[in-house]
């Protein structure tokens, strides 16, 4: 949280405060695990793709083509299949196709949904990112995966730092694809891996996928950013809490 807060403040004038997401995630990876590329497991693929997505978002900062959102969604779906490839190869063809298509669709929807928030107020993206990260991390943690839970919670706390700056200053803080793309990729892949390798029930993913859509579609009152953020938080956190609750009903208590 603190690293993300500092990063958002430092890069605010350059309109790159969205780098707070990858900064908060990277420091969590450094502290929570001894990261190496070999063997290239699904969890390590999440880290690698998260870092690559941040770099890609930085390169695409000045590009505003409409077709780009669809291209990024397709790339996100392909990244999901690559991440869970080894696990899918151990399943029957029917299960492999079903899980592969489901994971690809989930990540693609998150990438598309978070990218659509770029056309709205930055407050919507920050609120959706906070709820999506906390919902994914909390559900993964309850679903018996402490490391995946830390990944999601790191995203949520980093987005919360971004949101806090807007609430305290009562001013919008630019997000950009450096915020939305890494968050969607990491949260999406974390959810997919938690479903396949842990005890996260698959039907929590559609609930989490509605968070960016809800933040995009909900009408906001014509009032201060603080009031608008409370409205967004109530809606998005309700969905995140629903995903965590459903996971708890299946998996039981949080593993110690």
Where does each model-flagged region fall?
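C-terminal transmembrane helix-loop-helix hairpin of multi-pass membrane proteins
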Residues: 1, 149-156, 163-256
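N-terminal topogenic module of multi-pass integral membrane proteins
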Residues: 1-119, 217-256
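Generic multipass alpha-helical transmembrane bundles of integral membrane proteins
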Residues: 73-196
